[in-house]
Curated annotation (Swiss-Prot):
Residues 958-983 are annotated as: Disordered. PROSITE patterns: FN3, IG_LIKE. Residues 1-18 form the signal peptide. Contactins mediate cell surface interactions during nervous system development. Has some neurite outgrowth-promoting activity in the cerebral cortical neurons but not in hippocampal neurons. Probably involved in neuronal activity in the auditory system. It is found in: Cell membrane. Glycans are attached at residues 138, 196, 397, 449, 540, 779, 816, 931, 1002. Disulfide bonds join 123-173, 217-269, 322-369, 411-458, 503-551, 593-650. Residues 673-771, 776-873, 878-972, 977-1067 form the Fibronectin type-III domain. One of its GO terms (molecular function) is cell-cell adhesion mediator activity. The gene is Cntn5. One of its GO terms (cellular component) is axon. This is Contactin-5. It comes from the Eukaryota.
């Protein structure tokens, strides 16, 4: 219910705002030459007040947030500048601060007919301690006890049963805590109502046809704005506005520029309150035509126009009305004198209303409307002036000052007209005094004291609005204290160094500083100085400077002291050896750091590499710090890498000083990678490359090695170069023996006496130029195929060796013993076979064959000549002695003999078979390969007559079929399973018995039975055959056995019986008829029960 209520509230609220916005956007200028300025939906400012709240009769008071310019008046200042955001206050309740507005009261329009009968003016303030609230109406504080209708919850002021006569006015919230008070903006409470029209009958208006007329609305008392419309004759027939009819949204009057006979009737003025939506109707005004003729033509007479001076706020929308009576009906036009009407402007109601949204300063100027017809024209001019609400440029910040210090606060705001400034202290006007000046937004207090502490507000206002900025002033007054700035009680330095003893006591006013050594005052000289912040500095310290130093801070509220003891020690010296060392990658070294120091001081050693501390745990065991003696330390570097080269630092730290020394370590290693590799020139088999030298890593580069990679290589391969050996001082070379028309990328590797470095970044991918192919096809062979065909096959040339585009093959062949070659072109680079067909070529004719290559650059070499025979002929002899034997219900075994041939050697045999009830051309076929002369046909139908033929085949085709033979498949095995299966288990065997299976008429006779048994959990079982309906099954191992029985016949195995589960048990006897288990003393009854009850898996 709660969520539904909130939804209804939200929809009603948005509906109210939408209707209110529509009502306002429809208002315009008046018959009385007045201007109406209404809010734009995107406007950030609305009059001189914040946007009002509206009270719904059913939902109570509704509040609309104030516009953005109003938000500038609400300042969030952190006390003594300790916080950067207002939210920080909520997180630290220990900080005390003055009041800060969270929400200020909004303007409210309260409908007099509201069912709520309650008005709430909201005010919320933060502060620590929590603020208290008071309210003012029209500048006078409200006594909550003076009227039973008043109440306050937190800071919200509530008026029950509000009355326009007693409660309308300007309200302000005053919030106070121990730091002072702040005053909110003025919020207006006004009441919305709509009275009734006078009930007096209105006189008829009689005009001549063609004459203009004005029908007066004379609205009843109302607040605030109302919206006008007119009803013609009866509701809801409304007067439609056009170039001839116009309704002024200022006076509500209806203007008809030229009356027609269709206008005769009764007119009623309908007014609607923009807030309450209440509507009332006026008495009807009859409009009649006189019978003394038609009105002649006359020039326009402007009846509605805007004022001579129009003022409007920046960002709002202005609407200017202009309408004229005349015959013919006048046309209205608009212009801006000495300028152009803004492009964003819109003309409404047949150009009678000029609407300019989102007003800007450059929209100001003189506007003119002109009414014109064939009899003449009339114009009217007025000036549009744009004003702006105050807007902050510079606000106030919370401030704390020492007593006696000067204060200067400045607030700046823009606006048109230019804003004036007023100052408030604790909610009351601040007037100039002997120490206080206020002028042009500047507040100056020449010497602050505790009475000046409090909450201050700067008020910037012009005739259209006001904004507030608030800040807190704290006056500090306290004796000197060192609690927040503690000083080291013992200071140790070395000779000839600087001593700095800080002395920064907190206090207000700022304490005066003095120093003593023992009981003698410290006087400044060339070595000793008291700095502006109170600290004592001693240069070139010596033993004579040792002792206790006392700093004293004094102000009018008291004094405080600190004592620091100074000790002067001998300076520390350090030596790091060896100073410069050259090593090779993989070697080790020890750096020794020795310190000479004051014996009363402890020393600590720190090691650095290239200015950064060495992390001994993250360096992979390369570094180890060894402390053999109190005054020395060693750095062990093992298995040195190139990255370990650089300047090593040893720093010795005592409580008095810190000294350091450095040593340089050079590491020789393999070269770094050469720079960018550039391909400068390309031919069909070479590429000229250049590169920038590699880093030699302190060992001269002896040679470079060129490597290449292509789509056909296994990774990077070293290539031959010119010169053959690329010395370390060279930066270019030529890669040779490359394959034409292949994409390559190159890299360079440098070598020095220590080793080979990392390769360079690969060059860009390049392709060598095209060339005539040089590689002939390999493995030329052939044979087989169909009769009269010569089949030639070869291994295709890899793309790597095709050497260019347009690659193909030239197939040349000639009968063995002849001289002329016949050549055929094969254009596919992937081709591996060519078939030449000639009906005159006898089977197995030998041919000499060679295969060559070509591309766009020319012809390449041929392969070696090989001899290939043409295809053999089809088999000519039919298989003999074909027999077909039925094996089972679905199988027939076929056997034949074949005759050897010289020109038609079979590759295999094809057996065709079909049912007796089907034609031969529907035959299915099975093929064999090679010299096999038998086949088992499977998947046949039982008890069915099949016809069969056999024929040989090879690549040339099929031979003649054998004579037709026939065979009938066996009848189906019995479909009835063995029934009434009985068993008796004794020891390690089980005796079975069952009822004999009797086959149906279309089933084969039972030849015997098969008993299938297996141990549970095993997939493989055993079979026992028997001709009788009984059997003995051995159970060799302990466990549970699964047993089933099938009848078998010449048609195969029949349907299986239901499975039984039999336990193998050495003691006792179990039968399938037993229903109790009491005799099984050694058998687990639970196990046996499970064995008998659980279902078994099928075979």
């Amino acid at each position: 219910m709660a969520s539904s209520w909130r939804l209804i509230l939200f929809l009603s609220f948005t509906s109210c705002l939408s209707e209110y916005s529509e009502a306002l956007s429809g208002l315009s200028t008046s018959y009385a030459a007045l201007l109406r300025i209404k809010k734009s939906s995107t406007s950030s400012a609305f009059g001189s007040k914040s946007r009002p709240r509206y009270s719904s009769p059913s939902l109570g008071t509704l509040s609309v947030s104030p516009p953005s310019w109003r938000g500038a008046a609400q300042q969030y200042h952190s006390p003594v500048n300790l916080y950067h955001s207002p939210d920080a206050f909520r997180q630290d309740e220990s900080v005390d601060y003055g009041p800060v507005f969270v929400q200020e009261p909004d303007d409210i329009i309260f409908p007099t007919d509201s069912d709520e009968k309650k008005v709430a003016l909201n005010c919320e303030v933060r502060g620590n301690p929590s603020p208290t609230y008071r309210w003012l109406r029209n500048g006078t504080e409200i006594d909550l006890e003076s009227d039973y209708r008043y109440s306050m919850i937190d800071g919200t002021f509530i008026i029950n049963n509000p009355s326009e006569s007693r409660d309308s006015g300007l309200y302000q919230c005053l919030a106070t805590n121990t730091f002072g008070s702040i005053l909110s903006r003025e919020a207006t409470l006004q009441f919305a109502y709509l009275g009734n029209f006078s009930g007096r009958t209105r006189s008829a208006v009689s005009v001549r046809e063609g004459q203009g007329v004005v029908l007066m609305c004379s609205p009843p008392p109302h607040s605030p704005e109302i919206i006008y419309s007119w009803v013609f004759n009866e509701f809801p027939s409304f007067v439609a506005e056009d170039s001839r009819r116009f309704i002024s949204q200022e006076t509500g009057n209806l203007y008809i520029s030229k009356v027609q006979t269709s206008d005769v009737g009764s007119y009623i003025c309908l007014v609607k309150n923009a807030v309450t939506n209440a509507r009332v109707l006026s008495p009807p005004t009859p409009l009649t035509l006189r019978n003394d003729g038609v009105m002649g033509e006359y020039e326009p007479k402007i009846e509605v126009h805007f004022p001579t001076t129009v003022t409007a706020a920046k960002g709002t929308t202005v609407k200017m009305e202009c309408f004229a009576l005349g015959n013919p009906v006048p046309t209205i036009t608009w212009m801006k004198v000495n300028g152009y009407i803004p492009s964003k402007s819109r003309l409404r109601k047949s150009q009678a209303v000029l609407e300019i949204p989102n007003l800007q300063l450059d929209d100001a100027g003189i506007y003119e409307c002109t009414a014109e017809n064939s009899r003449g024209k009339n114009s009217f001019r007025g000036q549009l002036q744009i004003y702006t609400y105050p807007h902050w440029v510079q606000k106030l910040n919370d401030t704390q000052l020492d007593s006696g210090s000067p204060l200067q606060w400045e607030c700046k705001a823009t606006g048109k007209p230019r804003p004036t400034y007023r100052w408030l202290k604790n909610g009351a006007p601040l007037l100039p005094q002997s120490r206080v000046d206020t002028a042009n937004g500047v507040l100056a207090i020449h010497s602050v004291n505790q009475s000046d502490a409090g909450m201050y507000q700067c008020l910037a206002e012009n005739k259209y609005g006001a904004i507030y900025a608030s800040a807190e002033l704290k006056i500090l007054a306290s004796p000197p204290s060192f609690e927040l700035n503690q000083v080291k009680k013992s200071i140790i330095v070395t000779k000839d160094r600087e001593v700095l003893i800080e002395c920064k006591p907190q206090g207000s006013p700022k304490p005066a500083i003095s120093w003593r050594k023992g009981d003698k005052a410290v006087r400044g000289n060339k070595r000793i100085a008291i700095l502006p912040d109170g600290s004592l500095r001693i240069l070139n310290a010596s033993k004579a400077d040792e002792g206790k130093y006392i700093c004293q801070g004094v102000n009018i509220f008291g004094s405080a002291e600190i004592i620091a003891s100074v000790s002067v020690k001998e300076p520390t010296r350090i030596e790091l050896t060896p100073k410069r060392t050259e090593l090779t990658v993989g070697e080790s070294i020890v750096l020794n750091c020795k310190a000479m120091h004051d014996s009363s001081l402890d020393v600590t050693f720190y090691w650095t590499l290239k200015g950064q501390p060495i992390d001994f745990e993250k360096e992979g065991g390369h570094f180890e710090s060894i402390r053999a003696q109190a005054s020395s330390a060693d750095l062990m570097i093992r298995n040195i890498l190139l990255m370990h080269a650089g300047r090593y630092g040893c720093r010795v730290q005592t409580t008095a000083d810190s000294v350091s020394d450095e040593a340089e370590l050079l590491v020789r290693g393999p070269p770094g990678p050469p720079g960018v590799v550039i391909v400068e020139e390309i031919t069909e088999s070479t590429a000229t490359l250049s590169w920038s030298p590699a880093t030699d890593n302190h060992s001269p580069i002896s040679s470079y090695n060129l490597q290449a990679r292509s789509p056909f290589s296994l990774g990077w391969q070293t290539v031959k170069t010119v010169p053959e050996v690329i010395t370390g001082d060279m930066e270019s070379a030529m890669a040779v023996d490359l394959n034409p028309w292949v994409e390559y990328e190159f890299r360079v590797v440098a070598t020095n006496p220590i080793g080979t470095g990392d390769p360079s970044i690969p060059s860009r991918m390049i392709r060598t130029n095209e060339a005539v192919p040089k590689t002939a096809p390999s493995n030329v062979s052939g044979g087989s195929g169909r009769r009269h065909e010569l089949v030639i096959a070869w291994e295709p040339v890899s793309e790597e060796f095709q050497n260019g585009e347009g690659f193909g093959y030239i197939v040349a062949f000639r009968p063995n013993g002849t001289r002329g070659w016949k050549e055929k072109m094969v254009t596919s680079s992937d081709a591996s076979k060519f078939i030449y067909r000639d009906e005159s070529v006898p089977p197995l004719t030998p041919f000499e064959v060679k295969v060559g290559v070509y591309n766009n650059k020319g012809d390449g070499p041929f392969s070696q000549i090989v001899v290939i025979c043409s295809a053999e002929g089809e088999p000519t002899a039919a298989p003999t002695d074909v027999t077909a034997t039925s094996v089972s219900v679905s199988e027939i075994f076929v056997v034949w003999k074949h005759v050897k041939e010289s020109l038609g050697r079979p590759q295999g045999f094809e057996i065709g078979y079909w049912k007796d009830t089907e034609p031969e051309d529907s035959a299915e076929t099975v093929r064999t390969r090679g010299n096999e002369s038998f086949v088992m046909l499977t998947g046949l139908e039982g008890d069915t007559l099949y016809h069969l033929t056999v024929r040989a085949y090879n690549g040339a085709g099929y031979g003649p079929p054998s004579r037709e033979v026939s065979a009938t498949t066996k009848r189906h095995p019995p479909s009835e399973p063995p029934g009434n299966l009985r068993w008796e288990q004794q020891g390690s065997q089980v005796s079975l018995g069952w009822e004999p299976v009797r086959p149906l008429a279309n089933e084969s006779e039972v030849m015997g039975y098969k008993v299938f048994y297996r141990q549970e959990g095993h997939s493989k079982g055993q079979v026992i055959e028997t001709q009788k309906p009984q059997a003995v099954v051995p159970l060799p191992e302990a466990g549970v056995y699964i047993i089933e029985v099938r009848a078998y016949s010449e048609g195969g195995d029949g349907t299986a019986s239901s499975q039984i589960r039999v336990p193998s048990y050495a003691g006792g006897k179990i039968t399938s008829a037993q229903s109790t288990l009491h005799s099984l003393s050694k058998w687990s009854s639970v196990t046996l029960l499970l064995a008998l009850m659980l279902p078994s898996s099928s075979w």
